């Protein structure tokens, strides 16, 4: 499928899927990577982001499936001990594997500023990073700066318009 831009994996979890990117965010909400209609959908990158992860902030979406598939496992990060056991997210792209270290975990509204993209490495971005790190359910002891590129893994919760977010910075 030409919409495939990479692979996402969190070792020791069920999260290991192709990453999709298309001009229609709603398409992969209910289509598999093989473009078959399916309520589980796919894991996909925000349409407004570059598919090569060149943005300072890239957002990745996936459903919170009752059977534990897709991004259902993200909710386990509400426990600090789970983060200790699973601290990194790996993204395989055309230019190699990129390791991301988790620095913040929290719930937010679907229309939250947590979904802001299009940053430059300036004071606005630095303030944004400080804000989202401060929202974490617990201290991750990971430092994030305006020179860091980050990803947000986003899934729905049982609380209406709330989303569960796991934010990670690139760790080279």
Label each residue range with its predicted role.
Residues 140-164:
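Short, active-site-adjacent segments that bind or coordinate small-molecule cofactors and metal centers
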Residues 1-45, 50-55:
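N-terminal pre-domains immediately preceding structured catalytic cores
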Residues 17-23, 100-102, 168:
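Short, surface-exposed loop motifs enriched in S/T, G, D/E and P with embedded aromatic residues
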Residues 107-129:
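Glycine-rich, pocket-lining loop/helix-strand segments that form or immediately flank
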Residues 35, 41-114:
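Mid-length scaffold segments of soluble, non-membrane domains
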Residues 123-142:
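Flexible, polar/acidic helix-loop-strand segments at domain edges
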């Amino acid at each position: 499928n030409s919409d495939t831009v990479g692979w996402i994996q969190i070792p020791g979890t069920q999260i290991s899927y192709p990453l999709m990117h298309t001009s229609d965010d709603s398409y992969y909400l209910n289509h598999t990577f093989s473009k078959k209609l399916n309520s589980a959908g796919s894991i996909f990158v925000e349409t407004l982001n570059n598919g090569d992860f060149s943005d300072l902030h890239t957002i990745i979406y996936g459903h919170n499936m009752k059977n534990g598939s897709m991004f259902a496992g993200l909710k386990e990060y509400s426990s600090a001990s789970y983060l200790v056991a699973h601290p990194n997210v790996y993204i395989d792209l055309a230019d190699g594997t990129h390791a991301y270290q988790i620095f913040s975990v929290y719930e937010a509204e679907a229309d939250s500023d947590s979904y802001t993209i299009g940053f430059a490495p300036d004071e606005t971005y630095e303030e944004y990073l400080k804000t989202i790190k401060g929202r974490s359910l617990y201290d991750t002891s990971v430092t994030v700066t305006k020179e860091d590129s980050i990803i947000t893994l986003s899934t729905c919760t049982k609380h209406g318009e709330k989303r569960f977010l796991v934010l990670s910075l690139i760790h080279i």
